[in-house]
């Protein structure tokens, strides 16, 4: 084990080439969708980092690159001090044992022909566990940890025989059966009933304490991120625009985009007076992105010099960084057409 952050991402990019249409055949320039564009972040051991943003922000793509479901266009990922540049089969197998992912829709990610036992046992067999009693013990233990008790009631069921919450618990059990260091959860509660969501979030919290897991929690829902995560990284059109402690980012958002997201979170208090921050325009074309700050065309506080600024993260409060060139106190209503 090395010292320092468990995960370090440096200058990560993911560009998708755009297929040319007939009128573009004579255009020699290749265009790209810059889904993830030069982001860097660190995740400490035992930390839960939330990746927040609306659809198209690049948060899910970032998670999939870290777990190596997609290959980055460029950049470096370092896990426990080891850069993931080597492409040997042994390195990939070791990495997949240490980093696991939970997906948004458990029904689509569970093989309908596998019962619960086979679903959870498969990763063990792939990684060389052959002893049947050992496999049975670990499968049962993981079901119990995922709070499907008694495990014997679920071992021989198929996905269609389970509720949505039970399927997600099976997916979690499969994710922890190899005892990974890192768990990446991509919108794990967005398709569940509200009554079940808190149970799954509390389960993730207990897994962190019990197994010492480090997690990256991907979601558009700031309320669940605030409840679960230690820090939040807010993404917009492939860039991290703000990162900091979860409570501070929610209470004192420094970037206008974060302020828009926070203002949209429902609060169960009829007397609570929230800041009203809204945007009217749709996100810009991801192929032809605006110069400077990418939020400028939609930003209610945009000024004339925003179009020429860079995307550097500046520390605005202790351990809270924003890519906006203005401080919270300096933000004023838009003065450009």
Task: Describe the function of each predicted region.
Residues 75-84, 95:
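Conserved ABC transporter NBD signature motif
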Residues 83, 134-153, 262-263:
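Conserved ABC ATPase "signature" region
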Residues 3-5, 18-27, 32, 152, ...:
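Short catalytic/signature loops enriched in Gly
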Residues 188, 192, 196-274:
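P-loop NTP-binding/switch modules centered on Walker-like glycine-rich loops
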Residues 52-53:
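The feature captures the beta-strand-to-loop junction immediately N-terminal to the Walker
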Residues 157-162, 166:
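Conserved ABC ATPase signature
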Residues 177-181:
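A short, proline-enriched helix->beta-strand linker immediately N-terminal to the Walker B motif
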């Amino acid at each position: 084990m090395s010292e320092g952050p468990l995960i370090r991402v440096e200058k990560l990019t993911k560009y998708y080439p755009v297929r040319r249409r007939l009128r573009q055949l004579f255009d020699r320039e290749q265009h790209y969708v810059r889904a993830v564009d030069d982001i860097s972040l660190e995740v400490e051991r035992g930390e839960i980092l939330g990746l927040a943003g609306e659809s198209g922000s690049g948060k899910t793509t970032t998670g999939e690159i870290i777990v190596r479901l997609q290959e980055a266009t460029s950049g470096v990922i370092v896990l426990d001090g080891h850069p993931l540049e080597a492409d040997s089969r042994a390195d990939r197998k070791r990495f997949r044992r240490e980093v696991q992912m939970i997906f948004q829709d458990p029904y689509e990610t569970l093989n309908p022909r596998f019962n619960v036992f086979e679903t959870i046992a498969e990763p063990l067999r792939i990684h060389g566990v052959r002893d049947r009693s050992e496999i049975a013990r670990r499968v049962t233990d993981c079901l119990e940890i995922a709070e499907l008790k008694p495990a014997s009631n679920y071992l021989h069921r198929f996905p269609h025989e389970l509720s949505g919450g039970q399927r997600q618990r099976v997916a979690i059990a499969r994710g922890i059966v190899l005892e990974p260091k890192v768990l990446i959860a991509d919108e794990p509660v967005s398709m569940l009933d509200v009554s079940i969501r808190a149970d799954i979030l509390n389960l993730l919290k207990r897994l962190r304490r019990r197994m010492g897991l480090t997690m990256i929690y991907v979601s558009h829902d700031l309320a669940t991120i605030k409840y679960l995560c230690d820090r939040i990284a807010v993404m917009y059109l492939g860039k991290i625009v703000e990162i900091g402690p979860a409570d501070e980012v929610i209470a004192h958002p420094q970037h206008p985009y974060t302020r828009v997201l926070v203002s949209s979170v429902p609060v169960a208090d009829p007397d609570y007076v929230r800041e009203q921050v809204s945007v009217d325009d749709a996100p810009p074309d991801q192929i032809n992105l605006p110069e400077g700050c990418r939020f400028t065309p939609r930003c209610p506080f945009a000024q004339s010099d925003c179009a020429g600024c860079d995307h550097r993260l500046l520390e605005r409060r202790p351990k809270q960084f924003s890519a906006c060139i203005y401080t919270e106190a300096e933000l004023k209503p838009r003065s450009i057409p």
